[in-house]
């Protein structure tokens, strides 16, 4: 299905195989732009969370079609589906029953190793880890489910704020102002309790 979506949205020429999953499914990465500022995005660490995968394909299809100036300022790597085996079985976990977003330290899985390797080689200025979220999560103290939630991950148990985390918070603030000018959307802030085994927290600590 992913291959077809990439072809249908004219992203094939930007896309290559980063590596393979436990069950030998290809993990695809697309490269866009030529700017100095580097951004790494990945989706579907949890195989049953496919919304953002489709959103990424739609976004970059439009950006490339319109030859957006954004691509002149940024160099972007996109992993659409880090956990293709979980996607195939509609499971949060990979084929070995491991939650990839708890494998940042152990790096016991081929999918985790591929993400770490790309991070180390590409050396991004920003990382964006995309997930789905169930409607049981509310936006703040309201009874409304969060339509979207943001997180600037912690890098220590004290939830300290360093320059890197401050930049992430500022970027989230700017996005919030752009997408919610009337302040009438249900936008949440995800729990920032520190867990070094999660990739966001691990990358933030580097």
Segment roles from a protein language model:
Residues 1-26:
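Short glycine- and acidic-rich boundary segments immediately preceding or forming the N-terminal edge
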Residues 8, 121-122, 205:
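Alpha-helix C-cap/termination motif
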Residues 16, 20, 85, 98, ...:
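Flexible, active-site-adjacent loop/turn segments at secondary-structure boundaries
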Residues 28-36:
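Short beta-strand-to-loop junctions in surface cap/lid or active-site-entrance loops
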Residues 31, 89-92, 201-205:
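Short glycine-biased active-site loop of nucleotidyltransferases that positions the nucleotide triphosphate
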Residues 36-189, 193:
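Active-site/substrate-binding loop(s) of hydrolase catalytic cores
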Residues 189-206:
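Active-site-adjacent mobile loop/cap segments within catalytic or ligand-binding domains
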């Amino acid at each position: 299905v992913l291959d077809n979506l990439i072809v249908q949205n004219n992203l094939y020429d930007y896309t290559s195989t980063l590596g393979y999953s436990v069950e030998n499914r290809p993990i695809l990465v697309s490269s866009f732009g030529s700017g100095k500022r580097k951004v790494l995005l990945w989706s579907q660490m949890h195989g049953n969370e496919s919304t953002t995968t489709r959103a990424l394909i739609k976004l970059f299809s439009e950006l490339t079609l319109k030859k957006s100036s954004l691509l002149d300022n940024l160099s972007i790597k996109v992993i659409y589906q880090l956990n293709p085996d979980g996607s195939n079985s509609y499971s949060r976990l990979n084929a070995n029953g491991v939650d990839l977003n708890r494998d940042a330290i152990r790096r016991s899985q081929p999918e985790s190793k591929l993400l770490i390797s790309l991070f180390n080689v590409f050396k991004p200025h920003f990382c964006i880890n995309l997930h789905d979220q169930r409607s049981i999560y509310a936006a703040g103290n309201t009874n409304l489910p969060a339509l979207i939630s943001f997180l600037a991950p912690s890098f220590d148990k004290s939830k300290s704020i360093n320059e890197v985390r401050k930049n992430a918070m500022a970027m989230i603030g700017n996005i919030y102002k752009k997408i919610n000018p009337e302040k009438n959307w249900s936008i949440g802030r995800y729990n920032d309790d520190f867990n070094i085994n999660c990739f966001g927290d691990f990358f933030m600590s580097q």
